[in-house]
């Protein structure tokens, strides 16, 4: 298993303690050790100098819509094809992981099972993204934002 040593980072550990200088040893995709003050003596395949950089635990998005990309009006949710929505959801997953979110709770998506499909691809390692607790299609009352009936559909 690959080992990465991150040296000289300012570490925020989310315990309530003040940030501190130190080293992090990562094995695979898990933090194996945190050494306050630095000086980790463990061997590593890769060493990263994080001087002047900040390390913290991944964040969790508690109300996420992977496929709601640049949505400024209901039309932006309804008019894209299912194929376009798949790519939007994949980009949404990538944007979250790139921003430091390692988990997302899906509130709903523009198409049925969209977050489930993206979650499955992320879990299989074929798509970059956070851990996804997938939600389904948005449920809405008549006339509200999620209503796709003929009378309210802008298509």
Residue ranges of each PLM-predicted region?
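Metal-coordinating catalytic core of metallo-dependent amide/deamination hydrolases
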Residues: 123-155
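Glycine-rich, flexible loop/turn motifs
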Residues: 44, 73-74, 128
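General beta-strand structural signal in soluble alpha/beta enzymes
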Residues: 48-49, 105-106, 134
